């Protein structure tokens, strides 16, 4: 089954600056309509799976299709046989089933029926080191994660972190992934950015417009 999400590749607000591994994501993504989703299933996903099966290599696992929505419809940018990052952080916050059971069922060929998903909207905002995706410094002390996770539904996932002299410090370009759930994208954004404000490290950078296009679409 297809689960829709939207990534934000550019490092700065407004999709400006160089591309990164991803500065944030949200799910579901209203930019992909139900009609477009059916088109993706019929013209992209099913032919790939059918072709692999016909060649004696039936696919089992996670198939990530990176798409661009154009005036001519969805166009494929890339395929990955893994979750996207930070797409996974947003998508998996909505998964009600046990991920290990799902993965083992896929491996054994026992995965049938629909997975169960929370109805809420999920969002992930990446906190990055100054200079990313170029040269950046490491070893900056991180504070405020416990306070951030006091915001309802917020969970903070570590990426480029390490412990040095008993303190949590930065150890990569993308440092933390702050996630939240909400009844809609508006509430999810309010929660995640309230949590982001409680986290600090020297040179911390993040986009302030993750999910903003979905808010504008929601409000018409």
Positions of PLM-derived features:
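Internal nucleotide-binding/catalytic subdomain
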Residues: 4-88
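Generic C-terminus detector
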Residues: 162-165, 169-220
């Amino acid at each position: 089954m297809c689960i829709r999400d939207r990534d934000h590749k550019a490092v700065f607000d407004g999709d400006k600056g160089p591309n990164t591994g991803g500065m944030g994501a949200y799910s579901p993504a209203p930019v992909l309509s139900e009609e477009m989703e059916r088109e993706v299933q019929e013209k992209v996903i099913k032919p790939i799976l059918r072709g692999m099966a016909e060649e004696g290599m039936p696919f089992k696992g996670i198939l990530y299709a990176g798409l661009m929505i154009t005036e001519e419809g969805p166009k494929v940018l890339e395929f990955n046989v893994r979750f996207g990052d930070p797409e996974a952080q947003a998508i998996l916050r909505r998964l009600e089933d046990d991920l290990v059971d799902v993965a083992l069922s896929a491996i054994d060929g026992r995965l049938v029926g629909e997975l169960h998903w929370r109805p809420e909207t999920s969002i992930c905002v990446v906190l990055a080191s100054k200079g990313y995706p170029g040269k950046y410094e490491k070893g900056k002390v991180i504070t405020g994660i416990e306070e951030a996770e006091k915001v309802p539904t917020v969970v903070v996932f570590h990426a480029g972190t390490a412990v040095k002299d008993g303190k949590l410090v930065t150890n990569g370009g993308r440092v933390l992934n702050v996630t939240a759930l909400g009844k809609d994208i508006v509430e999810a954004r309010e929660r995640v950015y309230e949590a982001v404000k409680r986290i600090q490290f020297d040179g911390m950078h993040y986009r302030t417009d993750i999910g903003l296009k979905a808010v504008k679409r929601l409000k018409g």
